Amino acid sequence: MASKKEIKDQIISVTNTKKITKAMEMVAVSKMRKTEERMRLGRPYSEIIKKVIHHVLQGSLEYKHSYLEKRNDKRIGIIIVSTDRGLCGSLNTNLFKQVLFKIQNFAKINIPCDLILFGLKSLSVFKLYGSSIISSVTNLGETPDLSKLIGSIKIILEKYQNNQIDRLFIAYNKFHNKLSQYPKISQLLPLYNEKNIFSNKKIKWDYLYEPESKLILDTLFDRYIESQIYQSLLENIASEQAARMVAMKTATDNSGNRIKELQLIYNKVRQANITQELTEIVAGASAVSVD
């Protein structure tokens, strides 16, 4: 059994750890409120521009944009949004598992994937797997600057327009509530989905565009892609802070339980030492009295 000093040192060590995790929990709570508010403020714009795109694509567009072309899959692009830091539970792990599963499924039918990585954790993981990484952005912080992302976004969009990739996905963590975040992989391009909601053309119609449809639709579709990527970043950042808050609370609670266990062991050792000392005193006294 460990000595009293060793147990006491463990108690001090765990107590210090508890103070750190408690402080990190409080910081995460504060940051989560801000990031959650920022994320919720961004959702209406993201949803409305999605509805605008949906409505535009219901028409019979004279201008056939490359984002609407359905192609045979020869190469896939995936944007992966992760965190820059750890200590957020299994948030990144769950996302990476889904992405790797998707990459492996494409690999089985000889379709390679190009990756755009946002976040240091995704960069460190997918480098190990020898993935085809065409661009990466790290150190985004709690308030990502869209101007830092534009370069990487343009690279992947140019690849799509030049037929170098045939489909584009984005993988991120969707914020549900403070206790629930889940990995999500959505298709960005081409602008259709498996339910084909973007091509339901019962009545042929189109908008009247000024100055011309190409200029407006090019801008609109690019803004749509940018908004979806930026909103995914906000969702992931809010998820990160919520996951870190939960992880640090769990660590704090576990530290508290461990301190109680160690305190109990310490008391037992102390009691055993006292009992042993009393036994030795009584034995010594008995020996003296016999003499």
Swiss-Prot record:
Key words, A-Z: ATP synthesis, Cell membrane, CF(1), Hydrogen ion transport, Ion transport, Membrane, Transport
Regions crossing the membrane: none
Lipid bilayer topology: Peripheral membrane protein
CDD domains noted in UniProt: F1-ATPase_gamma (cd12151)
Gene Ontology cellular-component terms listed: plasma membrane; proton-transporting ATP synthase complex
GO biological process, one term: proton motive force-driven plasma membrane ATP synthesis
Principal cellular location given in the protein's record: membrane
Cell compartment(s), UniProt: Cell membrane
Listed GO MF terms: ATP binding; proton-transporting ATP synthase activity, rotational mechanism
Subunit structure as annotated in this protein's UniProt entry: F-type ATPases have 2 components, CF(1) - the catalytic core - and CF(0) - the membrane proton channel. CF(1) has five subunits: alpha(3), beta(3), gamma(1), delta(1), epsilon(1). CF(0) has three main subunits: a, b and c.
Stated family: Belongs to the ATPase gamma chain family.
Function comment: Produces ATP from ADP in the presence of a proton gradient across the membrane. The gamma chain is believed to be important in regulating ATPase activity and the flow of protons through the CF(0) complex.
Name of the protein: ATP synthase gamma chain
Gene (name only): atpG
